[in-house]
Amino acid sequence: MPDPDLARPRVVCLCGSTRFLDAFDAASILQTLAGNIVLSIATTRTADVDLFADRSPAEQEELREHLAALHRAKIDLADEVLVLNVGGYIGAATRGEIAYAERTGTPV
């Protein structure tokens, strides 16, 4: 049970592949029940590759860059980063997020 006297709950940013949406859901509820504020990806329950399939390659790249910048901003707000490495998988984008967190001093 969260401590009601806690001045501010810890802020946890979830990082991982959008292939594993169920892992994001599970981690989000577990962290919330542990009393943490959770920053995560926005999801429509569709993987990015499918969600943006109707956009041109240039639009897809621009959108990926925009979403990556937003996620780095979430990392900046977080007290820690929780990496969801389902089956040991950590993709290039997640490796970049981990490196960013480490460079900026956010514990991973």
Language model features with spans:
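Conserved catalytic or regulatory cores that recognize and/or transform ribose-phosphate-containing ligands
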Residues: 1-108
